[in-house]
Amino acid sequence: MKIIQEIPEKNIIKLIPENLDDLWHLSNIIQPYNAIYAVTERRTEDKGDKLRADRGTKRRVFLGIKAEKINFHEDFNRLRVSGKIIHAPDDIPIGSYHTIDIEPLLQVSVQKNWKKWDLVRLKEAEDSSKKPKVVVVILDDSEADIFLVREFGIKELVSIKSGVSKKLDYKQNEQAKFSYYSDIINSISEFEGKILFAGPGFGKNNIQNYISEKHKDLAPNVVVESANHTGKSGLSEILKSGIIDKIYGEARISKETQVIEKLLEEISKKGLAAYGIESVNNAMNYSAIDTLLLTDEYLRRNRRNIEELMNSVENINGNVLIISTEHDAGKQLKALGGISALLRFPIE
């Protein structure tokens, strides 16, 4: 995310989202009644040719809308914000509806009452654009699962079988193994960033040696770590371990996974945790909340009702962390009602 300009007296921040992660961050920052300004396409009628049955022509115009609906479309790499027009050229009626498609590299101005957690999230998005992206390959001698680590979740890219079998002789297995390595490399060769190989056994070390010999250009980006499991279980193990943070700086998904692990640990021992809206509100009555945890879905559904609680946590120097439901940690928080808190001290 690039922050272009801040205009505090108007509560406006001009910014440019650079990738899908930035669009996801914006989807959690923009809320109903915020004003959004951007260059967009608008279909207008040709006044001189009213007999034509077409829908007019599209042209690029600078519009402002008051947001009503905010929809993040991962598959289409865009964020759609719909609402009534509040600023437009003279020939476009104020109050009519429009949808602005926010895509990477489109400059957008957001006008809102900026909260601390909004600004923290914006800073995280700005910092994350400077960090290396990470692909995780969880493998053993028989199968490799390749994942892309994003700010808001994990994308499973491909699963590759090795073809190695006890039914084959040594030479055939060696050929199958090198073909396996080649398929893995082909799947990640165009990726610009760090590549983490992890899993049980020596498969991760063997492919590292193969890369050092055959693909020297990739070798500097390769990191190898141990994991006890393969597949998604191995990936979950890696996310909980903090290894991603050592490579990435502090990956948001890793941070979210670790904080939910801490929450579940505290719940299991009836320690410094509260979950469910009643329990969390009770903790706030004692000013006991250190970190308020909300799923993005819960926040979108209840933002107007929950914002007072978020402000109260901020006023006692607590933290507010919004957890994505696109990964397992977010799903675990969702199962707890979508809202929980880590506490400063125990309460009855």
Curated annotation (Swiss-Prot):
SUPFAM superfamilies: Dom34/Pelota N-terminal domain-like, L30e-like, Translational machinery components. Its main location: cytoplasm. One of its GO terms (cellular component) is cytoplasm. It comes from the Archaea. Keywords: Cytoplasm, Endonuclease, Hydrolase, Metal-binding, Nuclease. GO terms for biological process: nonfunctional rRNA decay; nuclear-transcribed mRNA catabolic process, no-go decay; nuclear-transcribed mRNA catabolic process, non-stop decay; ribosome disassembly; RNA surveillance. It is found in: Cytoplasm. SMART domains: eRF1_1 (SM01194). Its EC number is 3.1.-.-. It is an enzyme of class 3 (hydrolase). The keyword Repeat does not apply. InterPro entries: eFR1_2_sf, eRF1_1_Pelota, eRF1_3, Pelota/DOM34_N, Pelota_arc, Ribosomal_eL30-like_sf, Transl-rel_pelota. GO terms for molecular function: endonuclease activity; metal ion binding. Its cofactor is a divalent metal cation. Monomer. Belongs to the eukaryotic release factor 1 family. Pelota subfamily. May function in recognizing stalled ribosomes, interact with stem-loop structures in stalled mRNA molecules, and effect endonucleolytic cleavage of the mRNA. May play a role in the release non-functional ribosomes and degradation of damaged mRNAs. Has endoribonuclease activity. The N-terminal domain has the RNA-binding Sm fold. It harbors the endoribonuclease activity. NCBIfam families: pelota. PANTHER family: PELOTA (PTHR10853), PROTEIN PELOTA HOMOLOG (PTHR10853:SF0). HAMAP family: PelO. This is Protein pelota homolog. It comes from Methanococcus maripaludis (strain C5 / ATCC BAA-1333).
